[in-house]
Amino acid sequence: GFDELGEKGVLAGTVEQGRADLSFIPLALRKYEILRVDVTDKTAADALRASLPDSTARDIYRVVFTGETDERGIDLKSLEERFAPDFFRLELRDETRVGEDVWARAQEDSLRGFFLRELRAKLDAAQTEEERAKIQLAARFGLAALDGRDL
């Protein structure tokens, strides 16, 4: 699984007094790879395409998106539909956070502004990275609800 990345195989060779002649023989048909892709200031599709190695068709990939996005986040479903044929298996994860420009809208005199002000205060008071991630996710879902969008 993803806890053992890269090629798997055995070492074969001969060992004699004062000398060892060993070579790695890959045994696994597929490799597990984790690819972290920063999407700050670019689309997720462009960032993923630029990060991919030449050949992925035989291997199993987990792609973790990082960096900052707008309030909509990343549409993992459409990315999976678009890129899955290029992989034996593809798993996508969104670990992005809401960009700073979204928080600037907290000054609006509106329900959106009130919502963002309340969440920003919680974000500033958060003690752990896990708390911050939950608040970022709450912002993304809340803004989607205010706009009538699905995530």
Pin down the residues of each PLM region.
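Accessory, non-catalytic peripheral segments of nucleic-acid enzymes
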Residues: 17-151
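Conserved beta-sheet core of the metallophosphoesterase superfamily
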Residues: 1-17, 98
